């Protein structure tokens, strides 16, 4: 049975929590950010934030906090995970060490429904309210396990719980908000450490009913601030001080999301709310003999940020805004307003979580993932591609460019660019960042340039070579020149040059000429014909190279391909003797050829007119090569170019699917480039544009830098509202998007309001809730049609009050050539637990005028269509507790054909062939089969375990991957070896259990990376998933023969790497559902396996040498170097 290999293609980007303190040194200021299962530590410097380290955490981080005991000069970091593991970390000698660790779970306790709170006393005592009826007090000493005890705490409906700073180490006073039958109250209680019980100190009864957040104010001011939706209250630490209330227009119906202290004295606090407003709360404090007294408060508006979940004042007016729903930001507070705002964004950190839905689309021949991300004003679509990015520095509008050649004339940096058009040549002088069209020496600008370069460089060269279809020109900055033309006047078609040594090879129809450029001691120029050879066929492309493809050494051989014989030859220099003749594996004309060497491996690469590329491993000693390997790099004739980046040579494939080819572990890697089209390219390193590329798409030239490595690239399309579902329609090149728009007091740009055309509709039924229709909500649900390339909203269709778009697909029905969008909606009233009325609406986009959206049909259903799919040209829908199948009639109407009712609530469904996988809110997954002849569903198999499902996906027609609400993944398979149950069903037998640590929201059968043909280890059935934390993960099936091999590697790494939480890897990945626990099985932790690639090689080799090979397939590698190559191949899949 295959094993599931699970790995993160893009790690979590949601900010769980962030803190600022002195972690890496008592004089260092650090920003520490928790994301998913890792913590990033950054150093605050005058140049900005610098990465110090990344701390992997065995668990989903629930919260982090800083603590500094009296004898400590720097802070320690408290980490609590979702499974109630806790650790206290410190940074010593450049490493993260664990000072104390332990499990704080209460085996008999029930987790609180509405509040998890961690608060720290000034002397280091930690209080955690996580379980009903008690507060856990944690004492610790460095190098020991955590010691904790419970204190009884029976107050109902607690909103917040915090230690109060009294200025005394032995006074343990807490403040908390709770509500009972008499209203909401604020209470101060002191903890008696001897009796381990709380004793009431004071109580402020009947505070504002909307009070929910406590902010402790540092001593010497002391006390707490209470935040509500319409008011703020300050309560002093003692019973004698006056309570200070405050309200203003800025507080009207405000829901605060987080707060952060500005001054150590506690006179200023930053506040953020659900509208993304950044507010400053100021305490007006007076000092007297009896201490400090708060006289009044004031709130000022500073500007708008992402909806913040964590806010930290760093220093000098710089603030970090961490967000779960939008991009995190680094902002600066200003003393003077700019456009009504006192803040300016310095840097934005992309966040693609929470992911609500996603769809895989092929655009320009490259797969890309489009996700529904974020919520409310920070809702957006994110376009995600895997490849190498080019960051644009400058661009020049210049159409028709066919060649670009850098020139370094009497300079240590490139100072000219020769640009060839289809009928002429331009010389552009580079002065700083400016380009000027100039005349240079005797360069022929009346004809297109085939090749141009400086010779005998690389620096301070005064000699330029230009090749046109008529002649070769050699020119000196001293004014001397020398021209060479074919004796028979034939047209020069192809040229290749070894510039450092003055070697030129050119093709004129069927003849190859080898030329040598010479400069004598007096500076005179000469071009000598070294050799020529006539072939039987016309030459299509050629290239000069040598051993190592070193541009500083003389070329020793030539490789060329022919037009009509579809053959390739390797020719020895200087006598032009053929040493290798090869028939190419296709009858398409070769258009470009290169002989290169990367990582000491020689390759011959040939690109063909249909966009195919074939490459061979070439043995330069014997003149032989291996079997051809093929890759598609576009749909038009590609051209191959050598480019340099960071002092390393790569190959750039210019096409309508541009690719950069580099090597990893002596294997070629084809990485997509994040531009749509490249006609030609060159490397450039001028004074202003160092180590960059110049590319042309036929309309403009772009100067840009290249990413160091292949990575995920994210493009953001702000929507200004929550985007819930997305579908792609290839026939109209559009996306269909379901969204929810919430009206706000602030000015907002809503995508659904900016459509070219709008329309609206309501269900054609009498409302079941006339009372609710009288007070419609401030939220409107829409279905939008967006252009695939520009993401312009072409049409927005608004649904009725209380009606929410829940699902959408694009598809075709049987006997109908049209492609439709189908949208499922539900009338969701806030006081109803289950939707009673919904509808399925069928839309058609006009092929010509795509802003026209026609409502073809609508069907009222009893419930919410939570998921819809196309099944053999029919529509299958999960509607509350039923699965319904509708056929499409010739009258363009949906007609119910059959139903399945054995569900609580069907949240998701997937289709493969005639099979339907159903994810139920409580009853795990079941497998239905549509019997076409009988016209009904048959429940083929069922998982009898209780799982609270979120989503599912087919692995094969008889195996299913499930994601459930307790952050777990599992796999099940139809077990046909066991007897069928009494009611005629098989059992879906569990084959894998795994704790993911994040909520898997959506799964789809797809991949961003095409599997390399030369991979040692092959995989199948790729499934991508998106989580609430913004992780994009990938699960693939790997053949059973690799199972013990991968498990052994996983165990060896887990045993060798000490995790800061001091728990076993198997404990971390244990599947936990309520009181049930299942050891991890059927999955391999790809993140852990591939972490060895980030280790020092000596450390990695030592770990891999300890891998146990017991029970392995004999054909599998055992040498650590070969095992590492397998892991590198696994990393190439994403």
From Swiss-Prot:
Known tissue expression: Expressed at high levels in the spermatheca of adult hermaphrodites.
Compartment(s) of residence: Cytoplasm; Nucleus
Annotated GO biological process: DNA repair; proteasome-mediated ubiquitin-dependent protein catabolic process; protein ubiquitination
Presence of keyword Chaperone: no
Cited Pfam families: Beta-prop_RSE1_1st, Beta-prop_RSE1_2nd, CPSF_A
Pathway as given in its UniProt record: Protein modification; protein ubiquitination
Alphabetic keyword roster: Cell cycle, Cytoplasm, DNA damage, DNA repair, DNA-binding, Nucleus, Ubl conjugation pathway
Signal peptide, first to last residue: none
GO MF annotations, alphabetized: DNA binding
Family annotation (InterPro entries): Beta-prop_RSE1/DDB1/CPSF1_1st (IPR018846), Cleavage/polyA-sp_fac_asu_C (IPR004871), Quinoprotein_ADH-like_sf (IPR011047), RSE1/DDB1/CFT1/CPSF1 (IPR050358), WD40/YVTN_repeat-like_dom_sf (IPR015943)
Gene Ontology CC entries for this record: cytoplasm; nucleus; site of double-strand break
Predominant localisation class: cytoplasm
Function of the molecule: Plays a role in DNA repair. May be a component of an E3 ubiquitin-protein ligase which promotes histone ubiquitination in response to UV irradiation. Histone ubiquitination may be important for subsequent DNA repair. Promotes the degradation of the replication licensing factor cdt-1 during S-phase, thereby preventing rereplication of DNA during a single round of cell division.
Subunit structure: Interacts with cdt-1 and cul-4.
Similarity section: Belongs to the DDB1 family.
Identification of the protein by name: DNA damage-binding protein 1
Lineage: Eukaryota, Metazoa, Ecdysozoa, Nematoda, Chromadorea
């Amino acid at each position: 049975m295959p094993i599931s290999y699970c790995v993160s293609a893009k790690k979590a980007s949601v900010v769980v929590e962030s803190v600022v303190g002195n972690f890496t040194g008592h004089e260092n200021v650090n920003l520490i950010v928790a994301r998913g299962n890792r913590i990033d530590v950054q150093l605050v410097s005058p140049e900005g934030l610098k990465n110090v380290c990344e701390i992997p955490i065995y668990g989903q981080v629930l919260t982090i906090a800083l603590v500094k005991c009296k004898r400590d000069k720097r802070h320690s970091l408290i980490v609590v995970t979702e499974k109630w593991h806790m650790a206290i970390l410190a940074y010593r000698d450049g490493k993260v060490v664990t000072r104390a660790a332990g499990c704080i779970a209460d085996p008999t306790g029930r987790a609180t429904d509405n509040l998890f709170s961690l608060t720290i006393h000034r002397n280091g005592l930690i209080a955690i309210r996580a379980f009903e009826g008690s507060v856990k007090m944690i004492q610790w000493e460095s190098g020991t396990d955590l010691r904790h005890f419970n204190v009884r705490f029976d107050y109902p409906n607690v909103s917040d719980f915090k230690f109060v700073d009294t200025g005394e180490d032995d006074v343990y006073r807490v403040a908390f908000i709770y509500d009972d039958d008499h209203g909401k109250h604020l209470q101060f209680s002191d903890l008696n450490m001897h009796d381990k019980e709380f004793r009431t100190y004071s109580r402020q009864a009947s505070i504002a009913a909307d009070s929910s957040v406590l902010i402790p104010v540092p001593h010497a001011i002391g006390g707490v601030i209470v935040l509500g939706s319409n008011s703020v209250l300050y309560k002093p630490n003692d019973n004698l001080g006056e309570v200070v209330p405050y309200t203003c227009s800025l507080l009207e119906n405000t829901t605060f999301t987080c707060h952060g202290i500005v001054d150590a004295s506690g006179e200023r606090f930053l506040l953020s709310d659900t509208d993304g407003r950044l507010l400053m709360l100021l305490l007006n404090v007076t000092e007297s003999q009896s201490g400090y007294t708060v006289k009044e408060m004031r709130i000022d508006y500073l500007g708008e940020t992402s909806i913040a979940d964590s806010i930290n004042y760093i220093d000098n007016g710089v603030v970090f805004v961490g967000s779960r729903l939008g991009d995190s930001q680094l902002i600066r507070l200003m003393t003077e307003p700019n456009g009504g705002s006192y803040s300016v964004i310095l840097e934005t950190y992309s966040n693609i979580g929470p992911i609500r839905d996603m769809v895989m689309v092929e655009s320009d021949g490259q797969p890309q993932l489009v996700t529904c991300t974020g919520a409310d004003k920070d809702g957006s679509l994110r376009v995600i591609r895997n490849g190498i990015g080019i960051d644009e520095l400058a661009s020049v509008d210049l159409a028709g460019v066919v060649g670009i050649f850098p020139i370094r004339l009497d300079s240590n940096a490139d100072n000219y660019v020769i640009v060839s058009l289809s009928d002429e040549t331009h010389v552009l002088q580079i002065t700083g960042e400016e380009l000027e069209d100039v005349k240079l020496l005797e360069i022929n600008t009346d004809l297109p340039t085939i090749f141009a370069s400086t010779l005998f460089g690389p620096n301070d060269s005064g000699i330029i070579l230009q090749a046109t279809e008529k002649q070769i020109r050699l020119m000196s900055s001293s004014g001397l020149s020398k021209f060479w033309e074919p004796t028979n006047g034939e047209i020069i078609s192809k040229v290749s040059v070894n510039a450092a040594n003055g070697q030129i090879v050119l093709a004129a129809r069927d003849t190859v000429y080898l030329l040598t450029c010479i400069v004598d001691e007096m500076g005179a120029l000469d071009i000598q014909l070294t050799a020529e050879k006539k072939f039987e066929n016309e030459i299509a492309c050629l290239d000069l190279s040598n051993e190592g493809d070193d541009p500083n050494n003389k070329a020793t051989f030539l490789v060329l391909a022919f037009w009509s014989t579809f053959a390739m030859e390797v020719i020895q220099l200087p006598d032009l003797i053929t040493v290798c003749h090869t028939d190419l594996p296709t009858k398409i004309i070769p258009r470009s050829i290169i002989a290169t060497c990367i990582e000491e491996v020689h390759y011959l690469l040939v690109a063909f007119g249909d966009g195919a590329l074939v490459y061979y491993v070439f043995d330069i000693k014997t003149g032989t090569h291996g079997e051809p390997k093929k890759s598609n790099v576009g749909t038009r004739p590609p051209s191959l170019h050598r480019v340099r980046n960071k002092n390393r040579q790569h190959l750039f494939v210019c096409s309508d699917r541009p690719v950069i080819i580099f090597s990893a572990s002596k294997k070629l890697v084809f990485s997509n480039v994040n531009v749509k089209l490249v006609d030609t390219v060159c490397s450039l390193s001028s004074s202003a544009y160092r180590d960059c590329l110049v590319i042309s798409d036929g309309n403009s030239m772009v100067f840009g830098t290249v990413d160091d490595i292949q990575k995920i690239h994210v493009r953001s399309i702000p929507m200004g509202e929550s985007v819930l579902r997305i579908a792609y329609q290839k026939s109209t090149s559009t996306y269909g998007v379901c969204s929810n728009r919430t009206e706000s007091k602030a000015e907002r740009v809503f995508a659904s309001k900016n459509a070219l055309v709008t329309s609206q509709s309501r269900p054609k039924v009498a409302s079941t809730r006339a009372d609710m229709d009288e007070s419609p909500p401030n939220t409107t649900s829409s279905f939008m049609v967006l252009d695939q390339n520009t993401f312009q909203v072409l049409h927005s269709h608004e649904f009725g009050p209380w009606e929410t778009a829940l699902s959408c697909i694009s598809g075709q029905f049987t006997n109908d050539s049209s492609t439709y969008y189908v949208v499922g909606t539900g009338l969701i009233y806030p006081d109803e637990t289950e939707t009673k009325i919904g509808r399925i609406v069928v839309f058609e986009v006009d092929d010509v005028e795509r802003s026209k959206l026609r409502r073809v049909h609508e069907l009222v259903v009893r419930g919410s269509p939570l998921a819809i799919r196309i099944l053999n040209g029919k529509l299958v829908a999960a509607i509350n507790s039923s699965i319904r199948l509708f056929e499409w009639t010739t009258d363009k109407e949906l007609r119910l054909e059959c139903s399945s009712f054995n569900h609580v609530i069907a949240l998701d469904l997937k289709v493969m062939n005639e099979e339907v996988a159903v994810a139920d809110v409580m009853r795990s997954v079941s497998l239905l089969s549509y019997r076409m002849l009988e016209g009904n569903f048959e429940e083929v198999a069922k998982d009898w375990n209780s799982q609270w499902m979120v989503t599912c996906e087919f692995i094969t027609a008889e195996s299913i991957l499930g994601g459930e609400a307790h952050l777990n993944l599992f796999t099940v398979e139809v077990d046909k070896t066991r007897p069928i149950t009494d009611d005629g069903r098989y059992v879906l037998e569990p084959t894998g259990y795994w704790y993911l640590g994040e909520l898997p929201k959506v799964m789809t059968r797809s991949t961003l990376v095409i599997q390399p043909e030369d991979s040692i280890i092959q995989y199948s059935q790729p499934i991508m998933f998106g989580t609430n934390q913004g992780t994009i993960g990938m699960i693939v099936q790997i053949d059973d023969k690799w199972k013990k091999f991968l498990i052994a590697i996983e165990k060896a790494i887990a045993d060798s790497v000490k995790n800061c939480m001091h728990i076993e890897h198997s404990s971390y990945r244990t599947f936990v559902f309520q009181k049930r626990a299942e050891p991890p099985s059927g999955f391999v932790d790809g993140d852990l396996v591939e972490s060895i690639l980030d280790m020092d090689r000596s450390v990695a080799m030592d770990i891999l040498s300890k891998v146990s090979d017991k029970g392995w397939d004999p054909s599998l590698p055992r040498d650590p170097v070969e095992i590492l190559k397998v892991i590198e191949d696994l990393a190439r899949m994403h």
